[in-house]
C-alpha cells in the first residue's frame, strides 16, 4: 500500500493505492469531510465507467470530476483493472479551492504513475480451464 498527498488552496487531498494481484484500488479523499462520492472503474483498454452516489442534501456528489480525471491520466499504466473512489468535501468551498482540485488531481496522478513505474505490478498469472475442460 502506498499513500500520496498534495495540498493547495488551504486543503489537502490524499490517494491511497492498494495493489490487489494485477489490479489497483485507489481511494482519493480530502477536505473537511472525506467520504465516498463516486466509483470509477477501468482497464488499460476499456472506457472508464462511473457511478455517482447521492449526497446528504439529495443532490449527487461531483467527485467524479476527480476520479475520471485521474483515470484518464493513469489508464495507460494499468496492468489489470483499476477502481477509483473519490470523496472530497471542503466546507464553504471557495472558487479558488474548486479550481485547485484539477491541479491537485494531476499531482496525485503523477505521483501514482511514478510509483507504478518504480514498483511494477508482479503477481502470479491465474490458471483457467480450457474450453473443453470442466472442474472435477
Swiss-Prot record:
<dbReference type="Pfam" id="PF21758">
    <property type="entry name" value="PAC_bac"/>
</dbReference>
<comment type="similarity">
    <text>Belongs to the CinA family.</text>
</comment>
<comment type="function">
    <text>Probably involved in tannin degradation, however the precise biochemical function in metabolism of gallate is unknown.</text>
</comment>
<dbReference type="InterPro" id="IPR048844">
    <property type="entry name" value="LpdD-like_chaperone-like"/>
</dbReference>
<protein>
    <recommendedName>
        <fullName>Protein LpdD</fullName>
    </recommendedName>
</protein>
Amino acid at each position: 500500500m502506498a499513500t500520496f498527498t498534495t495540498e493547495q488552496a488551504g486543503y489537502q487531498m490524499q490517494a491511497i493505492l492498494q495493489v490487489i494481484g494485477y489490479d489497483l484500488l485507489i481511494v482519493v479523499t480530502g477536505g473537511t469531510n472525506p467520504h465516498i462520492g463516486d466509483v470509477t472503474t477501468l482497464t488499460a483498454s476499456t472506457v472508464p465507467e462511473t457511478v455517482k452516489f447521492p449526497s446528504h442534501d439529495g443532490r449527487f456528489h461531483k467527485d467524479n470530476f476527480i476520479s475520471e480525471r485521474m483515470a484518464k491520466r493513469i489508464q495507460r499504466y494499468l496492468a489489470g483493472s483499476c477502481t477509483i473512489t473519490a470523496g472530497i468535501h471542503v466546507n464553504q468551498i471557495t472558487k479558488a479551492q474548486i479550481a485547485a482540485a484539477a491541479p491537485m488531481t494531476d499531482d496525485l496522478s503523477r505521483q501514482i504513475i511514478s510509483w507504478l513505474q518504480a514498483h511494477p505490478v508482479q503477481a502470479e498469472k491465474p490458471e483457467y480451464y480450457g474450453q473443453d475442460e470442466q472442474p472435477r
